[in-house]
């Protein structure tokens, strides 16, 4: 059985990056929540 986490910078950026978050309403909410909480990193 192969491991579930196969790191890829490209896939990481495309799925969880800032631009990907801003593309949807739900993603924008995620960014807003993380901003209000004061997270240092908003997205991947």
From Swiss-Prot:
Record keyword ATP-binding present: no
Listed name of the protein: Large ribosomal subunit protein bL34
GO CC, one annotated term: ribosome
Top-level division of the source organism's lineage: Bacteria
UniProt xrefs under InterPro entries: Ribosomal_bL34, Ribosomal_bL34_CS
Cysteines joined through disulfide linkages: none
Signal peptide bounds: none
Gene (name only): rpmH
Record keywords, A-Z: Ribonucleoprotein, Ribosomal protein
GO MF, one annotated term: structural constituent of ribosome
One GO term of the biological process aspect: translation
Organism: Granulibacter bethesdensis (strain ATCC BAA-1260 / CGDNIH1)
Family: Belongs to the bacterial ribosomal protein bL34 family.
